[in-house]
Amino acid sequence: EAGFPISSPGDFLSVVEISKAVKIGVCALTRSKKEDIDVAAEALHHAKRGRIHTGIGSSDIHIKHKFNSTREKVLEQGTWAVRYAKNKGYEVEFFAEDAGRADLVFLAQLVEAVIDAGADVVNVPDTTGYCLPHLYGKRIQYLFDHVKNIDKAIISVHCHNDLGLATANTIAGLMAGAR
């Protein structure tokens, strides 16, 4: 992941130049907004294999307080963003921000919907570093047990180290089936 192109001219230029210089995949981070995805696609123009990494909050606390939204609107926005990014011709990775605190039934519903929309990779972040390893592993296992189309995408983890558990949580996620 080479940068967040819409965040600054420097990040945009970094993604452009890295895309020109390397022969491997290059990823650009976005929010689930049209302008973010458009700018990321432009920055990835020279990439041999580009990926747009887009997403939205999945926990009720993020949905209500960060996005002033509802679960239904998050489902709609997330699937729209995946389809829009996919139509740019790049691989798409979706992040379910704050998945560590998300309701598991809703998280599974969101993951299934974005895979149906075309996500190649679904990232399950412990955004706040809130999870303990055994619980994070169970969270990933729940997705593998309840998302019908989970075999159509790569499930990845992204654990923060607020409690010093990022490595342990990552290993727990991998042991539960994430890659």
Identify the role of each PLM range:
Residues 26-30:
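A glycine-rich helix N-cap at a beta->alpha junction
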Residues 159-165:
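Active-site-adjacent loop and "lid" segments of alpha/beta metabolic enzymes
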Residues 3-9:
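Short secondary-structure junction/hinge motifs that connect adjacent elements
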Residues 1-2, 66:
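Glycine-rich phosphate-binding "P-loop"
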Residues 9-21, 34-155, 169-178:
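Alpha/beta enzyme core
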